[in-house]
C-alpha cells in the first residue's frame, strides 16, 4: 500500500504560492481569460472518442512510463516536508477569473507521485493542453526551481472553491486516486477508478494510473472530468461529473469503460480506500492516547432485496477479506458515523469531520459481491481498508466492462430514507454477569441503534425484540433496552465460541415482522481482556 501512504501525506498539504506569469499572445480570448497558464493548440474532443482510444490502447502492448535518472533522483528528494515548501500560484489556476467557475490548481511531482500527467481544458467541444510552466511554482526549501526540468509536467490537480480559492474540495493525484473534502471540508478516505487483484495471495495488486485529463467547467461551480486510464492489464475511459459543493453532500456521476489487455483475476469496481486503526470496538488493543483513530468506522450496505447492513471495521492483526454476495445492490459505502469530537480528541486532523462515501449503482449491476479488505496496521499513516464491487469470475483479455454509478461524499452516515435505525456504536467486553465468575472464552457485545421509528418504542412495551444469529457459537444473556435519556436502543448479548470454526454474527431489532434497525454483522475473534 505504498502509493496510499504517500498520497495520504501529500494531500494533507494544500496551499497557495505567489509567482507571477503571463499567457503568451495569440491565444483566443476565452483561453486568455480562463487559463493562467500557456495552452496548446485546439483539438476536437468527445467522450466517445476517448472510449475508442482506450479500446485501441488495450490492443497494444503496455508502455510503462520512463523517468530520466536525473529527474528520478530529484523526485526522490521531494518528500512530505520538501513538498510543503513548493507552492502553486493560485492566480495561475484554470478558470481563476471566470465568475462562478471552480478554479483548478496543479500539483508538483514528488516521490509519491513520480509520473507526470497531461491536462487539457475543454471549451465549446475543443480541448487545449495546459502546458507545464515552471514559473507556476514557488520553491521555498532545499529544492530550487533550477533543479526541476522545464518540461517536468504536472502530478495532478485540485479543485478550489469558487468563492474561496484558499480552500479546495477535490483532488486527483497518484495512480487513479481521487478524493473530496466533503461537506465538512476535511479530507479523509479516497476513491479509485478501478482495483485490480487486491489482496490476492497468488498475484500482486496492480495500480493502473490516469495518464491524461480533460477538464470542462460547468455552470454553478461544477466540473466535468474526463480521464484516460492505462496499466499493464487494462486501459479505460472515465467520466466524472461533479456537482458544486453544498453543506450536505458532494455528488459525482461516474461512467467507467474498461478494456482488458490481459486477464484480470479480480476486478474491483468503484473501489474505496480508507484508514481504520481503532474505535470503541477494539479500543483495548490501541497504543495511542486518543480514544479513537479512523477515517471510517464501518461498511454500510443496502442490498438489492432492501436489507440494510452495517459491518463495523476491525483491525484484527491479520489480512482479512469479507464478501457480501448480492444481486443488483442499491448501494454500499465506507462511513464515518461517529461525529463527536470527544470520540477522537484531535484538533489537528479532525476525524469527526471526515466524509462518508456512498456508491449508488446506476443501471443493472447483476450478481456479484461487495468485498471488504482489512489490512492490519499499527499507525494512522497507513490506508488499510478497501471496499469495492466485484464478481467471482476472471475477466479474460479482450473484454469490455462498463459501469455507471453515483458517488455521494456526505456526512449523514446513512444514505437514503432512514426507514430503520442505524448502528451508532459497537462495544465489547468480558462475557458473564457482575459478581460472578467471568469465563475467558466468551465476549459480551453491546450494540447501540438510533434513528428511524425506533425512538417511538419504550422498553416497557415489550414489543421490540432482539434477533440474533451466530455460527459456531452459543448466545446467552441477550436483551434489548432503551438507553435512558436518549432515543437510542441497546442490544446486549454474550457469545461463547464452540471451537469448530469462525464465529459469524448477525443481529437486529424488530417489532413483530417489522425490522426496526439495520442488520449488524461482525466476526467474533478472541481478545485478551485481562
Each language-model region and where it sits:
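A contiguous, surface-exposed recognition patch within enzymatic or periplasmic domains that forms
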Residues: 81, 182, 265, 269-400, ...
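Terminal accessory/anchoring regions of large secretory-pathway or extracellular enzymes
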Residues: 34-80, 89, 346-530
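Extended, loop-rich substrate-binding clefts of extracytoplasmic carbohydrate-active enzymes
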Residues: 192-245, 363-378, 382
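Solvent-exposed N-terminal domain segments of exported/luminal and surface proteins
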Residues: 62-200
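Acidic, contiguous internal or C-terminal segments within carbohydrate-active enzymes
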Residues: 227-275
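Short polybasic amphipathic segments
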Residues: 116-122, 299-301, 333, 507
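N-terminal export signals
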Residues: 1-3, 9-31
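Hydrophobic residues positioned within well-ordered beta-strands of beta-sheet architectures
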Residues: 117, 223-225, 236-240, 252-254, ...
Amino acid at each position: 500500500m505504498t502509493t496510499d501512504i504517500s498520497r495520504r501525506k501529500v494531500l494533507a498539504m494544500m496551499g497557495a504560492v505567489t509567482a507571477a506569469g503571463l499567457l503568451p499572445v495569440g491565444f483566443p480570448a476565452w483561453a486568455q481569460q480562463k487559463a493562467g497558464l500557456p495552452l496548446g493548440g485546439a483539438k476536437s474532443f468527445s467522450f466517445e472518442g476517448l472510449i475508442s482510444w482506450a479500446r485501441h490502447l488495450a490492443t497494444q502492448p503496455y508502455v510503462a512510463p520512463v523517468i530520466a535518472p536525473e529527474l528520478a533522483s530529484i523526485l526522490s528528494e521531494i518528500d512530505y516536508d520538501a513538498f510543503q515548501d513548493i507552492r502553486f500560484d493560485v492566480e495561475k489556476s484554470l478558470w481563476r477569473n471566470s465568475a462562478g467557475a471552480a478554479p483548478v490548481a496543479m500539483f508538483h511531482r514528488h516521490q509519491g507521485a513520480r509520473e507526470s500527467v497531461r491536462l487539457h481544458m475543454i471549451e465549446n467541444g475543443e480541448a487545449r493542453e495546459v502546458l507545464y510552466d515552471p514559473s507556476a511554482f514557488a520553491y521555498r526549501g532545499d529544492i530550487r526551481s533550477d533543479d526541476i526540468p522545464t518540461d517536468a509536467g504536472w502530478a495532478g490537480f485540485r479543485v478550489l472553491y469558487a468563492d474561496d480559492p484558499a480552500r479546495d474540495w477535490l483532488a486527483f493525484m497518484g495512480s487513479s486516486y481521487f478524493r473530496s473534502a466533503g461537506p465538512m471540508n476535511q479530507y479523509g478516505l479516497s476513491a479509485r477508478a478501478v482495483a485490480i487483484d487486491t489482496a490476492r495471495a497468488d498475484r500482486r495488486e496492480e495500480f493502473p494510473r490516469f495518464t491524461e485529463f480533460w477538464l470542462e467547467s460547468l455552470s454553478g461551480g461544477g466540473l466535468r472530468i474526463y480521464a484516460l486510464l492505462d496499466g499493464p492489464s487494462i486501459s479505460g475511459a472515465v467520466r466524472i461529473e461533479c456537482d458544486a459543493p453544498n453543506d450536505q453532500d458532494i455528488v459525482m456521476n461516474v461512467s467507467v469503460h474498461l478494456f482488458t489487455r490481459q486477464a484480470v483475476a479480480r476486478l474491483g469496481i468503484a473501489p474505496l480506500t480508507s484508514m481504520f486503526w481503532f474505535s470503541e470496538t477494539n479500543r483495548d488493543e490501541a497504543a495511542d492516547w486518543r480514544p479513537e483513530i479512523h477515517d471510517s468506522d464501518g461498511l454500510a450496505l443496502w442490498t438489492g432485496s432492501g436489507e440494510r447492513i452495517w459491518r463495523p471495521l476491525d483491525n484484527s492483526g491479520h489480512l482479512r477479506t469479507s464478501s457480501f454476495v448480492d444481486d443488483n445492490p442499491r448501494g454500499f459505502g465506507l462511513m464515518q458515523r461517529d461525529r463527536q469530537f470527544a470520540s477522537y480528541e484531535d484538533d489537528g486532523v479532525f476525524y469527526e469531520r471526515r466524509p462518508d462515501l456512498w456508491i449508488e449503482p446506476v443501471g443493472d449491476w447483476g450478481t456479484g459481491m461487495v468485498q471488504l479488505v482489512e489490512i492490519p496496521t499499527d499507525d494512522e499513516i497507513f490506508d488499510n481498508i478497501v471496499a469495492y464491487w466485484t464478481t467471482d469470475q476472471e475477466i479474460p483479455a479482450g473484454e469490455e466492462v462498463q459501469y455507471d454509478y453515483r458517488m455521494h461524499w456526505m456526512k449523514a452516515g446513512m444514505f437514503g430514507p432512514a426507514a430503520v435505525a442505524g448502528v451508532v456504536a459497537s462495544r465489547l467486553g468480558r462475557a458473564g454477569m457482575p459478581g460472578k465468575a467471568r469465563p475467558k472464552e466468551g465476549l459480551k457485545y453491546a450494540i447501540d441503534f438510533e434513528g428511524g421509528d425506533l425512538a417511538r418504542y419504550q422498553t416497557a412495551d415489550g414489543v421490540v425484540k432482539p434477533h440474533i444469529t451466530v455460527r459456531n457459537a452459543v448466545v446467552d444473556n441477550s436483551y434489548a433496552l432503551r438507553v435512558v435519556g436518549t432515543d437510542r436502543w441497546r442490544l446486549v448479548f454474550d457469545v461463547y465460541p464452540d471451537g469448530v470454526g469462525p464465529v459469524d454474527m448477525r443481529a437486529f431489532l424488530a417489532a413483530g415482522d417489522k425490522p426496526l434497525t439495520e442488520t449488524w454483522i461482525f466476526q467474533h475473534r478472541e481478545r485478551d481482556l485481562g
